[in-house]
């Protein structure tokens, strides 16, 4: 089963997450099929969240499930998008 979830990057105390489409059996930071976006929770300036909506829609269309955290981030991105 394909799942869209966060893969952690960055360094100690400075997390950075890639939003990736991956097989659910793979490790959290392991092999993935496609990078769909990113989330930087410690960003002070600039962009902290970017999601390629077209690719997200594609993966959901072929049956990919969203992790609970990614669902929350997608809602957050959709709320922020009309204001921008």
Swiss-Prot record:
Q: Which family does it belong to?
A: Belongs to the bacterial ribosomal protein bS16 family.
For this UniProt entry, what's an example GO CC term? cytoplasm
Q: Which GO terms describe its biological process?
A: translation
| Superkingdom to which the source organism belongs | Bacteria
Q: What is this protein called?
A: Small ribosomal subunit protein bS16
GO MF, one example: structural constituent of ribosome
- Keywords attached to this entry: Ribonucleoprotein, Ribosomal protein
Q: Which Pfam families match?
A: Ribosomal_S16
């Amino acid at each position: 089963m394909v799942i869209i979830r966060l893969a952690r990057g960055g360094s100690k105390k400075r997390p950075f997450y890639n939003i990736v489409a991956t097989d659910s059996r793979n490790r959290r930071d392991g092999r993935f099929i496609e990078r769909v976006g990113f989330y930087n929770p410690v960003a002070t300036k600039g962009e902290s969240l970017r999601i390629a909506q077209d690719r997200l829609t594609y993966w959901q269309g072929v049956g990919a499930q969203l992790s609970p955290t990614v669902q929350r981030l997608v809602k957050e991105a959709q709320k922020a998008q009309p204001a921008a």
